Amino acid sequence: MKRGFFLLLLLVSVSLPALAKSKNRSVFDKDHMNVSLYGRYCHMLDGHGLYKNMLDTYGSPMAGVQMGFATEPSDSSWWANAYNYPQLTFGFSYDGAGNLRTKPGTRMGDFYSIYAALEFDFFRAGFFSLGPVIELGASFSTSRYDPLRNPANKFIGSTLVADLSGGVEAKFRVHPHWEIALTGYLIHHSNGMTRVPNWGTNQAAVGAKVRYYMAPQETKRRISLEKPAFPKGLRWNVYTAAGVHSCSIEQNALQKAGESGYPVKPRLRMLVGVEGAWRYSRLLSTGLGIEGNYAANTYRENDLILEGREDPKGYSPFYTSVHLVQNIHYQNLSFHLAWGVYTFKRTGLAEDMGRCFQRIGARYHLPAFKVGQMFLGFDMRAHFLDRSYCLEYSAGITF
């Protein structure tokens, strides 16, 4: 499981510098560099009433430090200009969730996180700017589920979890070198179902940040630059992906059968897929795709224990799906969001995958080969919008 997140961080570290590449120079120098300190107040979101058996309080402090690299008009990058000069940031944070008061016999742990972030300023007026931020990284939790010592903490099932955050920052330039910001974030911690139980945690956070620029930042302005060529029209993506899934239904069956049910063996998930996407601008493409999936499972055994009978429709490790995908492009990097429907599945009576799924991820497109352009990527697949299913690593070709 830990190996999978290290692979994810390696892929992010390799692909994100593409966002910071300019036509004439790199942004990884002192003239582009800045450092930040921030603090936030985090509140556990409990819309489903899941924390009532564990928590007495819901608020915790967070503090962090960042090192950022801002793109500038003088970089002469069409991509940076098109996205209104985004910024690439690397950060470390401490979330004192271990300070939450809990019921006797259980505890929540602190989170120590490292991450990479993309900051965008979609609105500017004088010394004020406003825009979204996306953070992706890994968190070390000081406390996780244990069937004997911490049975109520079904939210964190492993020591290392993914850290995914999204938010909005309102920034005020108070000096050529100094900036302050008011921030609002949504924060999610999950291990992608590599080990159960893994209900994950969701938090809302508000705070403030102080940033110091090593060099006075340039006045951000849209300039006229030569547009790069791009492959307009229909493009095909052929890919395969794999990951693992530790099933909570299997855990329930094992516990009902008298076993501890921890840890539950992670089982293989694999797929092959084809997408046809229409690239109608340098920044956007939209498409449709089909996938054939394989899932190692214990569906029949789970039903016999939990339901007392087999599913008359039978069982199959294979299932199929169709999906709609929206891509956002930045040089060789693309981000995508997919919404799909399972067209065939035989998962039994106890398993509840639902009919629909969601996928969010990124792909880094390698230099072109004679036939097409290879890419490496990752996806987080979910059901019911908030149920993690699998962290998938993919490889494919675009032509």
Regions found by a protein language model. Give the residues of each.
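Transmembrane beta-strands of outer-membrane beta-barrel pores
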Residues: G39-L45, T71, F92-G98, L136-R144, ...
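Surface-exposed strand-loop-strand hairpins of Gram-negative outer-membrane beta-barrel proteins
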Residues: H43-G64, R101-M108, S246-V272
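Residues on the lipid-exposed face of transmembrane beta-strands in outer-membrane beta-barrel proteins
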Residues: L37, V65-T71, I114-F122, I134-A138, ...
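Short loop/turn motifs that connect adjacent beta-strands in outer-membrane beta-barrel proteins
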Residues: K21-H32, S74-P86, F123-L130, R173-W178, ...
